[in-house]
């Protein structure tokens, strides 16, 4: 049976819980099996059924659409950025990659594919991009 995106997100976060902190108080968080992410001050966030977690502390309007992220994915998949992604993977130090403004995650996925020992973490304020990931 294939696991849902939500369950995969929870399992991935539990496996790398030391890299996450509460966006409100900066304390370490616990990732519970039910998808609740909570800190010692009881700030809590829930993993969405689509397999992402919203750590934003206030609503943000994004001007990016699903169509934009689909087009972005197509361009990145065309190979246009292959050499750049390979070079970034070569230059990177450490086992974690943080891609801020990751969109649908195409760049990060291709960089991490060149570094199988590494873990990629992508964040973006555009919900459409994160859902597409």
Which positions does each model-derived feature cover?
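N-terminal auxiliary segments of SAM/dcSAM-dependent transferases
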Residues: 2-62
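Conserved SAM-binding loop
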Residues: 133
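Conserved SAM-binding loop of SAM-dependent methyltransferases across substrates and taxa
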Residues: 104-116
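Glycine-rich helix-loop-beta junction characteristic of Rossmann-like nucleotide cofactor-binding loops
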Residues: 87-93
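Class I SAM-dependent methyltransferase Rossmann-like catalytic core
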Residues: 62-83, 87
């Amino acid at each position: 049976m294939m696991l849902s995106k939500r369950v995969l997100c929870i399992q991935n976060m539990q496996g790398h819980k030391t890299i996450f902190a509460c966006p409100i108080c900066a304390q370490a968080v616990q990732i519970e099996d039910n998808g609740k992410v909570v800190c010692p001050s009881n700030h809590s966030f829930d993993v969405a059924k689509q397999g992402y977690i919203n750590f934003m502390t206030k609503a943000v309007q994004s001007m990016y659409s699903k169509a934009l992220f689909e087009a972005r994915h197509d361009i990145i998949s065309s190979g246009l950025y292959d050499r750049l992604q390979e070079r970034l993977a070569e230059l990177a130090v450490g086992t974690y990659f943080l891609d801020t403004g990751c969109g649908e995650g195409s760049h990060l996925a291709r960089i991490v594919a060149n570094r199988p020992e590494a873990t990629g973490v992508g964040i973006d304020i555009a919900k459409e991009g994160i859902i597409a990931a």
